[in-house]
Regions:
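Extracytoplasmic/secreted proteins, especially bacterial periplasmic and envelope-associated proteins
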Residues: 10-14, 32, 53-60, 79-83, ...
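Contiguous beta-strand/loop segments that form the cofactor/metal-binding neighborhood of enzyme cores
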Residues: 108-109, 121, 126-130, 135-339, ...
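General small-molecule cofactor/ligand-binding pocket signal
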Residues: 2, 28-30, 96, 208, ...
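N-terminal glycine-/serine-/threonine-rich beta1-alpha1-beta2 phosphate-ribose binding loop
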Residues: 1-70, 82-94
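Short strand-turn motif at the edge of the Rossmann-like AdoMet-binding core
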Residues: 72-74, 98-101, 129, 338
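Solvent-exposed loop/turn segments at secondary-structure junctions
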Residues: 7-11, 51-53, 75-77, 101-104, ...
Length: 379
């Protein structure tokens, strides 16, 4: 690690001090990315900025020929996603999207099992991400302390419509659209990405959803509770995905369960079981055979998903960073290529469009845009 770039002088200093405390290294401090790239003393960057900035910051890195590890979501609008995708592909940099499930040992086992055909046709997927955290994405003390003069508000906004300085939208951006979609971009994109990975579909055919701010009425604009229903594929190979998430009660925690006619693949227990499979008494009546999966443990080594904001403490994130660093050295494709980032962006933006308009969202392959009510969705 040779330096830290941050437009807020406090975070810039704190970042450098943190690195020194951990490594003993005295690193450079850059006021912005242009200053960092002008010095040209770096080989790669880790982009951990506001959600809506990720794709644009990736473009900057790609144009400077720097390898990238970028946090998810990749983009919150299709225009940004397209820019990021094209920049990475043109530059041929090593790219890793921060979807750390793609480096989890149990997720690789699940992917291999489904693709082997032993699981059978996926007929339904249920996903949850529940916490009880009124403090999640809140930074009230820092909101009181930060001053506009100590950062660069115009640079922060990048391509979003200009509005006057807001310390909450700067620091608590995950609660405010169009700086973040909130739950879809922060959590859902992790889980829906596994659907694309395991099944080979690039994006949903349609998404409907609703939600609201039902409890934490603290001025936020993004929902504290939401449910979305995804339709994938067609009449021959299609299935439904049900996703729900709430900030208001943690029962159920994080769940990802794949269903076939023969049972379930549960990524919370890391087991395949015949739970819910077709039993003989019902099958025989229709001249069919019983269909019950053999029990199967995905992996002896569990890669556990966590609900803490500090994702650096889980082994999936460590494995994912290691995979990126290895690929930077050997110039091979990472576990989280830019196509995966682009595809989870499509699903995320479709969900945001459905939630914010109350309409069914679809995707136009020809123009690569999310459509609601016959119009392209942006903000």
């Amino acid at each position: 690690i040779v330096g830290v770039s941050d437009i807020w002088n406090r975070r810039r200093l704190e970042g450098a001090e943190f690195i020194k405390a951990k490594t003993g290294l005295k690193v450079d401090k850059w006021r912005n990315n242009e200053e960092m790239y002008e010095k040209n003393k770096i080989d790669s960057v880790i982009i951990s900025t506001a959600d809506f900035q990720h794709a644009i910051h990736t473009v900057e890195a790609a144009e400077s020929k720097k390898d990238v590890y970028v946090e998810k979501p990749f983009a919150e609008t299709m225009d940004d996603a397209i820019l990021g995708l094209n920049a990475v592909k043109k530059s041929k940099i090593i790219f890793q999207i921060g979807s750390q499930r793609r480096s989890g040992l149990n997720y690789h086992a699940a992917n291999n099992y489904i693709k082997s055909g032993k699981f059978g046709k996926v007929v339904m997927v249920e996903m949850k991400w529940n916490v009880n955290q009124p403090d999640r994405w809140r930074l009230p003390s820092l909101v009181k302390e930060i001053k506009e003069k100590d950062t660069d508000w115009k640079r922060y906004l990048i391509n979003r419509p200009f509005e006057k300085w807001s310390p909450r939208k700067y620091l608590e951006y995950r609660l405010f659209w169009p700086y973040s979609s909130g739950i879809p971009g922060q959590w859902m994109c992790h889980q829906i990405d596994t659907v694309h990975w395991f099944t080979g579909f690039n994006h949903p055919r349609s998404v409907v959803g609703n939600g609201g701010i039902y409890l934490w009425k603290d001025g936020r604009e993004n929902f504290d509770t939401m449910t979305a229903v995804f339709d994938y594929g067609d009449s021959e190979n299609g299935f439904q995905v049900l996703y729900s998430s709430r900030f208001t009660n943690s029962a159920g925690g994080i769940q990802e369960i794949y269903y076939s006619n023969g049972g379930e693949l549960n990524l919370k227990t890391n087991k395949v079981t015949p739970n819910g499979g077709l039993k003989a008494n019902h099958a025989n009546k229709m001249g069919m055979k019983q269909n019950l999966l053999d029990e199967f443990k995905l992996d002896e080594v569990k890669s556990k998903a966590i609900t803490s904001a500090n994702t650096g403490v889980d082994n999936m994130t460590s494995l994912h960073i290691h995979n990126w660093m290895k690929c930077v050295r050997d110039r091979k494709e990472t576990n989280g290529p830019v196509e995966a980032a682009y595809n989870h962006s499509i699903a995320t933006i479709m969900t945001t469009a459905a939630l914010r308009t109350g309409l069914k969202a679809t995707f136009d392959e020809k123009i690569q845009q999310v459509i609601v009510g016959g119009k392209i969705f942006k903000y």
